[in-house]
């Protein structure tokens, strides 16, 4: 005879009306998403969350509520990407590690949002930047490689542990030659550097970013501009590193100066180099894998924190 699972009823006390509102989401959107993931019924009555369903599912649902507590407890709505990341951690048996994510607040954005890693691998990446002078991050688009590195740089700058933030990337990533593009130098390189400015604007705001650039505290420049320099007291971020050649990667890495850190980011599935050139990032991942003082972090589609469809799109193109 098939055993019938027992049903049950769980209650969780909520600390405030703001927390209750955040946990519900607009039009109960969060509760509905929660129900679709866990298979239990959720209702908020006053300052209590009530859950009904079979016991095993109730236990998982309760665990999922607790994993997202650091967000909704502060009266903040739980983004779908955070809910999905928590659910994924629960499925992989990593709930204890995921519970620490909410405590890892790196900074606050200009709008007051808490900036923090959203997945376990993102947390490991942030901790690598904190503990190593050279960190490589390899993973698909949307996994927060550049954004989190920039947030870490902002935090170090605020704590006066560095004096400068340098963001760079190859200026030619689609086979175009700058000499044949219209406009002056700034107009030519701006489209390639725009993603870096976007990260800065989301952290510092437009006006403060421009002010820090004017003061020379933040520098955003093509990779070629790094040649011949020694970068001291800085956090230097190389973005789109998969599109560097071996010689460019070597040039960049040897710019590391005293009391500085470097972060090298890239997606080795999106290499735009031509003429069968070897990617400097791919080669570096082979020759530095066992080098003491250098850390490699690998992010996956499960770490994508853009629109939920992005994960599905990346998976579909594999």
Question: Model-derived features: where do they sit?
Answer:
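Flexible glycine-/small-residue-rich
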Residues: 14-16, 44-46, 53, 169, ...
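Short glycine-/aliphatic-rich beta-strand segments at the starts of folded cytosolic domains
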Residues: 2-21
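Short amphipathic alpha-helix segments
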Residues: 19-36
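Conserved helicase motor core of SF1/SF2 NTP-dependent helicases
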Residues: 110-122, 128-238, 242-318
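Interdomain "pre-motor" coupling segment immediately N-terminal to P-loop NTPase/helicase cores
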Residues: 43-102
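A short, structured beta-strand/loop element
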Residues: 36-43
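Proteins enriched for Cys/Gly/acidic motifs involved in redox and nucleic-acid/cofactor modification
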Residues: 87-118, 130
């Amino acid at each position: 005879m098939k055993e019938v699972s027992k049903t049950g009823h769980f209650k969780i006390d909520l600390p405030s009306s703001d927390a209750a509102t955040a946990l519900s989401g607009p039009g109960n959107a969060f509760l509905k998403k929660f129900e679709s993931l866990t298979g239990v019924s959720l209702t908020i009555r006053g300052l209590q969350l009530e859950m009904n369903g079979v016991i095993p599912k109730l236990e998982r649902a309760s665990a999922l509520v607790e994993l997202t507590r650091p967000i909704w407890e502060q009266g903040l709505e739980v983004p779908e990407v955070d809910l999905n990341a928590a659910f994924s951690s629960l499925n992989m048996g990593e709930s204890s590690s995921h519970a620490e994510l909410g405590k890892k607040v790196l900074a606050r954005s200009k709008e007051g949002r808490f900036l923090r890693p959203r997945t376990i691998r993102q947390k490991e990446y942030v901790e690598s930047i904190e503990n190593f002078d050279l960190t490589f991050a390899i993973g698909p688009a949307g996994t927060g490689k550049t954004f989190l590195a920039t947030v870490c740089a902002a935090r170090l700058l605020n704590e006066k542990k560095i004096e400068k933030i340098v963001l760079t990337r190859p200026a030619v990533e689609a086979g175009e030659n700058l000499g044949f593009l219209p406009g002056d130098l700034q107009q030519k390189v701006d489209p390639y550097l725009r993603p870096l400015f976007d990260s800065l604007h989301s952290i510092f705001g437009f006006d403060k970013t421009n002010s820090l650039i004017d003061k020379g505290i933040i520098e955003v420049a093509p990779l070629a501009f790094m040649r011949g320099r020694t970068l001291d007291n800085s956090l230097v971020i190389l973005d789109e590193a998969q599109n560097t050649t071996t010689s460019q990667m070597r040039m960049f890495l040897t710019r590391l100066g005293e009391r500085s850190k470097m972060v090298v980011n890239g997606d080795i599935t999106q290499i735009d180099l031509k003429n069968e050139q070897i990617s400097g990032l791919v080669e570096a991942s082979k020759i530095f894998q066992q080098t003491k003082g250098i850390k490699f972090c690998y992010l996956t589609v499960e770490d994508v924190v853009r629109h939920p469809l992005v994960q599905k799109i990346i998976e579909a193109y594999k």
